[in-house]
């Protein structure tokens, strides 16, 4: 389990570095990135709560993150990072079958995705 936490934590930081290096002049892209970035922040906060055995509070944050990711997905259905986090947050709240679907959909887009 710790291995997965380390793996996903590493993924979170690498995604932020990649996102920080890109620039967009489109308002739609900025809104989409904002939803995604907000969701990532919620996931990180939830992870910290889990480490403190505050599982129920963490699940609420994962659910909030998922809602933001859903909105980001609606505007960009070809983003494997969004699908990865959708799978991750769904798995964290206990919906393993749905999580698998998101992971598999992300792998269809990018078969060698590091986080999936």
Please report, for each region that a protein language model flagged, where it lies by residue:
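Start-of-helix register in tetratricopeptide repeats
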Residues: 33, 81, 114-115
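Canonical positions in the second alpha-helix
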Residues: 72, 105-106
């Amino acid at each position: 389990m710790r291995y997965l936490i380390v793996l996903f934590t590493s993924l979170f930081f690498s995604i932020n570095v990649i996102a920080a290096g890109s620039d967009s002049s489109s308002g739609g892209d900025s809104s989409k990135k904002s939803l995604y970035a907000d969701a990532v922040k919620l996931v990180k906060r939830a992870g910290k709560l889990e480490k403190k055995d505050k599982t129920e509070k963490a699940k609420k944050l994962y659910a909030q993150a998922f809602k933001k990711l859903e909105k980001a997905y609606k505007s960009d259905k070809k983003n494997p990072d969004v699908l990865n986090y959708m799978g991750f947050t769904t798995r964290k709240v206990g919906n393993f079958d749905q999580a698998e679907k998101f992971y598999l959909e992300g792998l269809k887009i990018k078969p060698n995705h590091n986080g999936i």
